[in-house]
């Protein structure tokens, strides 16, 4: 019972982290002006301008929906087939979210530092608020990845462990006096 509660709490935590990561990124935008001589030129930053950030929003949304469904399934059914499915899906979605977070981290790094070999300048000096919120979204997403990895480990131990994780404790036989 305690393991089931822990699993549900971890899945709820993954839901909350993924929703927060998606919302922070999806709402992230900033408008600014730079001066070219005496002419102010407007600049705009939106998450939708960068494919990796769009991927991050969708991946977080998919993980949140999956974890919600997994909570319902784990509360309603107990079977080895379901345990195997959750084990597989926990890993698959951890990899999906890790890929989205890694791609977005690379874009954020280039935005912060630039890429000298390609003569790309950094942009975060003009969009500090935008870049800070990208960082917040990435932290939330990587935390969600860690929760999913933990769930995959727990699912694997439950499925393949000897003795199985969360198995009911065996009670020693009661000896009756002769």
Curated annotation (Swiss-Prot):
Q: How does it assemble?
A: Homodimer and heterodimers.
Q: How does the protein associate with the membrane?
A: Multi-pass membrane protein
UniProt record similarity statement: Belongs to the Casparian strip membrane proteins (CASP) family.
Coiled-coil portions: none
Question: Which residues point to the Extracellular side?
Answer: 26-52, 102-132
Q: List residues traversing the bilayer.
A: 5-25, 53-73, 81-101, 133-153
Q: Which Pfam families match?
A: CASP_dom
In this UniProt entry, which residues form the Cytoplasmic topological domain(s)?
A: 1-4, 74-80, 154-178
Organism, as annotated: Pteridium aquilinum subsp. aquilinum (Bracken fern)
Protein name in UniProt = CASP-like protein 2U3
Compartments annotated for it: namely:
Cell membrane
Q: Name one GO cellular component term.
A: plasma membrane
Q: Which UniProt keywords apply?
A: Cell membrane, Membrane, Transmembrane, Transmembrane helix
């Amino acid at each position: 019972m305690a393991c089931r509660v822990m699993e549900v709490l971890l899945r709820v935590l993954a839901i909350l982290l993924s929703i927060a990561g998606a919302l922070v990124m999806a709402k992230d935008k900033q408008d600014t002006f730079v001066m070219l001589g005496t002419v102010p030129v407007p600049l705009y930053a939106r998450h939708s301008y960068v494919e990796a950030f769009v991927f991050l929003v969708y991946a977080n949304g998919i993980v949140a929906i999956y974890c919600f469904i997994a909570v319902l399934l784990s509360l309603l059914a107990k079977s080895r087939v379901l345990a195997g499915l959750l084990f597989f899906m926990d890993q698959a979605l951890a990899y999906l979210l890790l890929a989205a977070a890694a791609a977005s981290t690379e874009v954020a790094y280039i935005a912060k530092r630039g890429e000298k070999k390609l003569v790309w300048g950094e942009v975060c000096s003009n969009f500090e608020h935008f870049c800070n919120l990208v960082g917040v979204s990435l932290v939330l997403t990587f935390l969600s990845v860690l929760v999913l990895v933990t769930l995959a480990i727990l699912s694997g131990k439950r499925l393949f462990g000897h003795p199985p994780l969360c198995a009911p404790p065996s009670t020693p036989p009661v000896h009756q006096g002769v």
